[in-house]
Regions:
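Short, small-residue-biased leader/transition segments that mark boundaries at the very start
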Residues: 1-6
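A detector for small-residue-rich transmembrane helices and their helix-helix packing motifs
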Residues: 7-219
Length: 219
């Protein structure tokens, strides 16, 4: 995030069989982000703070004083420049599929949206006195995905598909480090997204019985 001035009858298969399962929702989310970015570039400039504000980026006074709550959602699909969207979509592409297969299509969509909206809300409340900040980006939701995966991997004996706990912890550490040593980064959105993701994973995820993965896990 950047700122600018289940239980029915189940057939069980080994965990590795889940690699072939399609993560449709994650692909759709990436496509929506890219399409919105292209729209912004065609109609204006995604690096112009005022233009981004007019298109639905986060701006605390607009939400709190004018009731424009839709910004909590629209800002999740907006990015400031090509590097911003490329970095976020690369992480979502690499990690999102894993969590979607673990949660299921519907739960994953709910999870992602709640992480993004929730992190935007927390960030907004932390910047209520800041009338000069316009923010946008999917990284609050993406940090939520990382947090959700951290919980899921941890309770699955430290491993899920090709991910392990150590990889995720290192990723979280370096992502937060880069955020706190860079300018124009909404670290509050990142941290809150991470925490919200862990909480939602605790609520939504159900660990398969034994060491095997339920084929009916995708809904």
């Amino acid at each position: 995030q950047r700122q600018m001035c289940i239980r029915d009858r189940e057939r069980v298969e080994p965990m590795g069989s889940q690699y072939g399962k399609k993560a449709y929702v994650n692909g759709l989310l990436i496509a929506l982000n890219v399409l919105f970015f292209l729209y912004l570039e065609i109609t204006g400039s995604s690096e112009d703070a005022y233009f981004m504000y007019t298109k639905g980026a986060m701006y605390a006074p607009a939400v709190l004083e004018d009731g424009e709550y839709y910004r909590l959602l629209t800002a999740m699909f907006m990015h400031f420049g090509i590097r911003h969207i490329m970095n976020n979509m690369l992480v979502l592409f690499v990690l999102g599929d894993n969590l979607e297969r673990a949660l299921g299509h519907v739960k994953y969509l709910i999870f992602y949206l709640l992480c993004g909206i929730g992190s935007n809300w927390v960030s907004m409340m932390a910047h209520t006195a800041d009338t000069m900040t316009v923010s946008a980006g999917a990284s609050g939701a993406i940090f939520g995905v990382v947090g959700g995966l951290l919980y899921v991997v941890t309770i699955n004996k430290g491993r899920l598909e090709d991910l392990n706990t150590r990889q995720l912890v290192v990723m979280i550490f370096f992502s937060l480090y880069l955020g706190y040593t860079s300018t124009g980064v909404d670290n509050i959105a990142h941290l809150s997204g991470l925490v919200i993701g862990i909480i939602l994973a605790i609520i939504l995820y159900r660990r398969p019985k034994g060491d095997r993965w339920p084929n009916g896990g995708i809904i």
